[in-house]
Amino acid sequence: MNGHISNHPSSFEMYPSQMNGYGSSPTFSQMDREHGSKTSAKALYEQRKNYARDSVSSVSDISQYRVEHLTTFVLDRKDAMITVDDGIRKLKLLDAKGKVWTQDMILQVDDRAVSLIDLESKNELENFPLNTIQHCQAVMHSCSYDSVLALVCKEPTQNKPDLHLFQCDEVKANLISEDIESAISDSKGGKQKRRPDALRMISNADPGIPPPPRAPAPAPPGTVTQVDVRSRVAAWSAWAADQGDFEKPRQYHEQEETPEMMAARIDRDVQILNHILDDIEFFITKLQKAAEAFSELSKRKKNKKGKRKGPGEGVLTLRAKPPPPDEFLDCFQKFKHGFNLLAKLKSHIQNPSAADLVHFLFTPLNMVVQATGGPELASSVLSPLLNKDTIDFLNYTVNGDERQLWMSLGGTWTKARAEWPKEQFIPPYVPRFRNGWEPPMLNFMGATMEQDLYQLAESVANVAEHQRKQEIKRLSTEHSSVSEYHPADGYAFSSNIYTRGSHLDQGEAAVAFKPTSNRHIDRNYEPLKTQPKKYAKSKYDFVARNNSELSVLKDDILEILDDRKQWWKVRNASGDSGFVPNNILDIVRPPESGLGRADPPYTHTIQKQRMEYGPRPADTPPAPSPPPTPAPVPVPLPPSTPAPVPVSKFPANITRQNSSSSDSGGSIVRDSQRHKQLPVDRRKSQMEEVQDELIHRLTIGRSAAQKKFHVPRQNVPVINITYDSTPEDVKTWLQSKGFNPVTVNSLGVLNGAQLFSLNKDELRTVCPEGARVYSQITVQKAALEDSSGSSELQEIMRRRQEKISAAASDSGVESFDEGSSH
């Protein structure tokens, strides 16, 4: 029910892993042996001896480890792939380009084979008999994957061996390698069994720093009863009703906002849009990887003669599985929220503009709709609704193909809140991001007020999500005859499972969420009490190794979100959250009021746009050039005439216009002329505004709006580099641009000329932020050309004149004429 209309059960089930590092399974039942034994003393002695021996055997029979499959290479001299070191070198290159796609699985070792098992279905993916394993090696701390297990396997049917690489976090690669090597040694008939001792060593090994959690810590469990559902929804509805009549036109007090307030609000919207685009990009890459794996799997099956599964097909089958339905629903919700944000930011972002980004987003939206087998699943996504401004903006912006796709998604994508029945409950939308990031609070709204409203909205959204899952569970028991999902093309959803339900059925399912017209909050509702914040100071630098961890620098002040385990979840001053080991943190006293969590400085760019698919050609005129007034944080200005943006690539930077500048009126006027066809007197409902601006525009009390809001200004000097810059200058410039330590250390050894000589692909190979570095270098080059172009031309003309004068003085008028003719 969390914005999802569903009448069909989901056939996906999650199986929690019971294997954490080391496990075992007995080989036979001791009870049967006891029943078959004689009662003589000799038999009793033999029985006890066998029991002791078999206890060791049962412990060392099977061991299981949770690992991440990184990639598989074919060892071929033609590809310069001969040794494990060659594979690690190629893994580094793939990692630098962002082309490593990990897959969680179970690696199982027994006395006959090494097997790979699907984490969810528990099906065996691959089976490598011990006699086919030619080499086993642990590679520690050689790249960003710090615990790599390498297996070289060659079956009799293969011409060339395969190199399989795994990242091992929970149990380190050197321990797993010892287990496999001992199993291989024992299988060759050695007199002394090595494996029991190896397994005892593994089970007694001190893990050192504990492994990070696989997912953020869960919220405290709460009882979600029918009364709880009604009271929470009543509280939300009462608050919404208290803000104004249902059909009352919008009476926002944006005119009372200071330029600093508006800048802070826009900054946060841009950050949210950044993370939405990142999550959509990640999901699209996931789909593309699944499609590539399915294509390779189909190719192998066509060329295969027998029915026996070939080497590597098990892992390919796992990689070809599409994402679960909940991830598709989350992606569709982020598309809708992204469109709402673009409509709000259309006057504030440029290069590319909001209209360009709309064209860009329709390309992956079309891909996701096709991957689900049609618009049915997207049509079931109710929350968040597009607001009136967004619908008008899309009507004005989209081209013919985009409009056809948009209209095919139905009323949940084309109707604003005012067009839905008043009694129709629309759950609030609280976006959750893959890396755990949460939008920073707006200080001028009052932290307590905004946090209470945010928690209320999140509580209602959680209740709606719980109700939706309960409904799916109930329907799955009633309709057990529904066929399971079997993709026809490896990543397309079966349309007979996800069909759009009628609004009548959806209304019946939401009967528990019927809002009340009462203007007062239910007195039985008790808002969540906020715990006092705790802070810690990092003693050392720590570099994150995966998406759940957080990179921190020495002396960083971090807010502690969860300290119940050995790895603490913390949030830095920029609003990013993740896990760090608790032994690098010192508890500190909370900072003074108002200084606990400052708004992060605005970066003025949406940087991470690395998707390879490009936007359709836009029908709108190009974005206006940036205003001459500098932005709040000084950055080098681009040249007056920006270079044309190629259609096949998405631009790397999105800058926003300075909304607090008095000189930006020209750009705003031009923008208003572009959108003059948009109706300006459209009425909006208050509930629509609640849906549109759930997180960061819930309310601003009139008393709070009258308070003077001060944003501390940072006098950051402008740092530029030239072709003559030293490596120290380059390092300082990289740090001033906010690049991570890996990028600074990798490129900080180059001088200005060397850095300017690198192209985008070379930069991407050197560091993960290569695309962003290239865009900043382009800006620097343009600024240098703009400032030095005229002086260089004058220098060339001066040298030419000196050469002509010298020729004239040496050879007379005739020589001068000859020089002129040339």
Swiss-Prot record:
The PTB domain, residue ranges: 64-194
Annotated InterPro entries: EPS8-like, EPS8_2nd, EPS8_PTB, Eps8_SH3, PH-like_dom_sf, PTB, PTB/PI_dom, SAM/pointed_sf
SMART domains: PTB (SM00462), SH3 (SM00326)
Gene name of the encoded protein: EPS8
Record's comment on post-translational modification: Ubiquitinated by the SCF(FBXW5) E3 ubiquitin-protein ligase complex during G2 phase, leading to its transient degradation and subsequent cell shape changes required to allow mitotic progression. Reappears at the midzone of dividing cells. Phosphorylation at Ser-625 and Thr-629 by MAPK following BDNF treatment promotes removal from actin and filopodia formation. Phosphorylated by several receptor tyrosine kinases.
Organism: Pongo abelii
Family, per entry: Belongs to the EPS8 family.
Localization annotation: Cytoplasm, Cell cortex; Cell projection, Ruffle membrane; Cell projection, Growth cone; Cell projection, Stereocilium
Region feature (Helix bundle 2): 752-757
Residues covered by region (Disordered): 1-39, 201-225, 298-320, 612-689, 787-822
Protein name according to UniProt: Epidermal growth factor receptor kinase substrate 8
Compositional bias ranges of the Pro residues kind: 208-221, 618-645
Ranges where the record places region Helix bundle 3: 762-767
Region (Helix bundle 1): 718-738
